[in-house]
Regions:
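Catalytic core of pol beta-like nucleotidyltransferases
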Residues: 1-27, 33-40, 51-111
């Protein structure tokens, strides 16, 4: 799993990013968790929940997190939230491949 390898190279930095941005949970899905990943063209697909009730703060954290993850992974990152997924076919596709990679309640990387 490509995403696992990238995170394990800089585990402390990844954990700090998740804590700084108050991530409640973070899932990876799509090609980065399958054998379909292409090092030249694939992006990283992430599903995140931020633990912040203020919509402005939550939005600012999401934008900052997206920018930081693109720097961390050195590639394009698609960052989605549960509430942004309205298409049932997309939801089913995400649910079929998603893997929990960070649990904010335990402040632990799970890969």
């Amino acid at each position: 799993m490509v995403i696992k390898d990238e995170i394990l190279k800089r585990l402390t930095d990844f954990n700090a990013l998740c804590q700084l941005h108050k991530i409640k949970y973070l899932y990876a899905f799509g090609s980065s968790v399958t054998d379909r990943f292409n090092y030249d063209t694939s992006d990283i697909d992430l599903l995140v929940e931020i633990d912040d009730n203020d919509p402005i703060e939550r939005g600012e954290r999401l934008i900052s997190l997206w920018d930081n993850f693109e720097g961390f992974f050195h590639r394009k990152v698609d960052l989605l939230t549960d509430s942004s997924i309205r298409n049932p076919y997309l939801r089913k596709n995400i649910d079929s491949t998603k893997i929990l990679i960070y649990d904010g309640s335990r402040q632990k990387v799970l890969i």
